[in-house]
A protein has these predicted regions:
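Residue-level recognition of single "structural anchor" positions
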Residues: 1-237
Length: 237
């Protein structure tokens, strides 16, 4: 779960570790995902971020915003420039939200660090780069953020004009479809947290396992009873 870029399915984990009961492996994986989410919740994004939404759920006739039976997921990736001046991705964060409204986007940004300031009084989060969806413009004004709006005349150009955030989204959908063969909407957030945790530590391959063990022993545990409930399987699309 820590080092494989596409994660590991519960069945494969069960086989590798010699765990007899599927339920035991499933619970263990969710305990690890909670530790991942708790550790990443300590961090805040700063400077400029790329931000966009996507839809996770069963395939349907109606694509994009307004899709039925799909969960809205907001994704943000912080950006910085390397020594050669090339834009690079820093930290990624994904969250399941109620809808694509400015209110949902505002709550999302507050979780990322919008509001807290530096010693000089500047916001940690200064600017967002998004497509032209009206909710982003409104939340940028409400939060006093610079808004770098990218006009997408062709939806297929999103991956080129907002490359990092769409790379993270595409990776998440590939993992959910491929490795896990779909996940329930109830537990979608924990899988997204796992995917972001690995992405955020992609340069720490030698340390990531030990860091995850430390996160696991220092987080509040979760029980099987707290995890289960009525749910239906939904494939990412």
């Amino acid at each position: 779960m820590a080092m494989d870029k596409v994660g590991v399915s519960i069945s494969e984990m069960q086989r590798l570790l010699g765990i007899k009961q599927y339920r035991t492996a499933w619970l263990m994986a969710h305990k690890v995902r909670k530790a991942m989410a708790d550790r990443d919740s300590r961090y805040r994004l700063a400077g400029l971020i790329e931000m966009d939404d996507s839809f996770f759920g069963p395939r349907g006739k109606k694509p994009g915003r307004g899709s039925e039976r799909k969960r809205v997921v907001l994704c943000a990736v912080s950006l910085y420039r390397d020594r050669e001046g090339k834009e690079r991705a820093g930290f990624a964060y994904m969250r399941v939200v109620e809808d694509g409204s400015a209110e949902s986007a505002g709550d999302f940004l507050e979780r990322l660090g919008c509001g807290p300031t530096t010693g000089e009084g500047r916001q940690l989060l200064e600017a967002i780069r998004t497509d032209g969806w009206r909710s982003y413009g409104k939340v940028a004004r409400d939060k006093d953020l610079k808004h770098c709006k990218v006009i997408l005349r062709d939806p297929k150009a999103a991956g080129r004009l907002l490359p990092w955030v769409h790379r993270v989204i595409s990776n998440a959908k590939a993992v959910i479809r491929g490795t896990h063969r779909g996940v329930s909407s109830k537990h979608l957030q924990s899988y997204l947290s796992e995917i972001c945790y690995r992405f955020n530590r992609r340069f720490w391959e030698k340390e990531i396992f030990d860091r995850l063990v430390l996160a696991c022993v220092s987080t509040q545990t979760i029980t099987y009873k707290g995890l289960v409930g009525h749910e239906t399987s939904e494939l990412a699309s």
